[in-house]
Amino acid sequence: MRPFALSAAVFAATALSQNKGEKTKCADGLYMIAVRGTGEDKGSGRIGEIAEDVSKRVNGSIVSPLDYPATLQDPDYFDSEEAGVKALSAALDGYHSSCPNGKIAVFGYSQGGQVATDVFCGGSDNKPLTMSLVKDSVVAVIAFGDPSHVANLTYDRGTSKNDGIFERPSNETKLCEDNYSDIIRSYCDTGDVYCDVGKNNETHGSYFEKYGKEVVDFVVERYEKALKDESTSTQTSTAAATATAETSGSATASDAPSATTAAPGNAAAGLVPGLVLAMIPLALAVSEYL
């Protein structure tokens, strides 16, 4: 990966300054970031249509297009992709800070797929997101036709057996395989010019129709699982806290002295009058023989 060039840095700074001061709206459902592919018009692109399909099944969801160049030239691909990485990292950090209980899904196509995987796995001179943020908030990461695709990973889907034109190094794939294989799905089919180094130009645009429904089902399933796990965790924590409080209360009660129990000194003193009374009949009986 090339060093971050001035043009991309300026773009990223401009995008961030535009968003600075804007109040983030927290989604009642999923907050989905769509990262369009190279050459697509500004907006969420074709990958955004998949996100919109998810929103139809998850009420209260928001689809947010990532603002980045998505260009091949001016700025060139590498600068554009790095600007996307910076912008996506900032968007995820910002949403998590504003909506700590919110759930996020990321969708990336082509160059956008590389942007997404760079953010989570590391790449483009970028440190990956903190693991705690991902575990807390991110339920799914979808990539279609990622040029940095590496074949035969646990989160790969599709028919490709080859690495992409910008093959990702093993240390980055290991990070994602070890920690995020349950939330990432990277689709690449045989023949794709960019993710499979193939010769079929049509393959690169075929994922939407071919895998769209599968992706929607996966994202919805991951979202529902996250909510269920969160609910179970909350119930377990509440039950544990209640049990601790009850145990503490019982221990306090058992440790307190009984109101009906006399102090040792008083009990001994109470025996003296009783003994004296018991001795009177005996003394009278003895006196008769004297």
Name what the model sees in each region.
Residues 264-290:
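Cleavable C-terminal sorting propeptides in eukaryotic secreted/cell-surface proteins
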Residues 10-28, 285-290:
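N-terminal signal peptide
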